[in-house]
């Protein structure tokens, strides 16, 4: 972690990355656009809010085995000065058809 922090600080407060895949246990965030990366504070959080544009995808074994699936997406904000995150967005989706790529598209609600 120390080397990463030193590298980010040496680059300056912002560096641009050309794309990223953040793979979770059931879904992944895929972004082909430029992402803002910032310096990390002493407590391990970013010093400023970062914008992470992208799409939710199913990769490999993450693709649901059923024809239609339900799910929810929660966007949480972790403020650096507070202990608890707060929900910025909560979306419930139902009857989403299984697709091998973008998740939560063509859902009924």
UniProtKB/Swiss-Prot annotation:
Residues carrying covalently attached carbohydrate according to the record: 43
Pfam families recorded: Herpes_gI (PF01688)
InterPro entries hit by this protein: Herpes_gI
Membrane topology value: Single-pass membrane protein; Single-pass type I membrane protein
Cystine pairings recorded for this chain: none
Subunit record text: Interacts with gE.
Family from the record: Belongs to the alphaherpesvirinae glycoprotein I family.
Stated name of the protein: Envelope glycoprotein I
Provenance organism: Cercopithecine herpesvirus 1 (CeHV-1)
